[in-house]
């Protein structure tokens, strides 16, 4: 198990982004610095080490791998994209950690866990995706009693109401400036940043 946050970030630096990202799925890689900080904090709160951690919409696996490096007993990453899952499996082999990656729609995932740590689509690109992160949150709370989930900061007020409606409580918040590199043809800038919040949500 890694004992310094800096070492965790260094271990995650070489996790690659998706080779052929689909704009509808908003397949942005969580930066190593943010992934390390969040999973380090989750571990400090007793939500990772020795537990089963699930990553819904795992992409190439950076959050799953971070949980495995921080001593999770079992890690499961789920993503509908087969290319992303294959890359995640390769990264687990490279880092010599145990993690199980499934090519599956998250809505069809039936297992239970102790903690979900996920970065779902922000719903920032298309109107049809604007409910995506909220659907992920509803699913996550069926999988585990504790959820860490990335969302656009501007949706925070709505999410507070949603969490309450789901009979759950926001116990911690982590704020990040999330860099979005120019990976899609419609992007005008080389890189832009969006303000995100990670909610720690606990089922009542």
Segments (PLM) and residue ranges:
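Conserved SAM-binding loop of SAM-dependent methyltransferases across substrates and taxa
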Residues: 60-72
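Conserved glycine-centered beta->alpha loop in an early N-terminal alpha/beta scaffold
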Residues: 57
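Conserved SAM-binding strand-loop segment of SAM-dependent methyltransferases
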Residues: 96-106
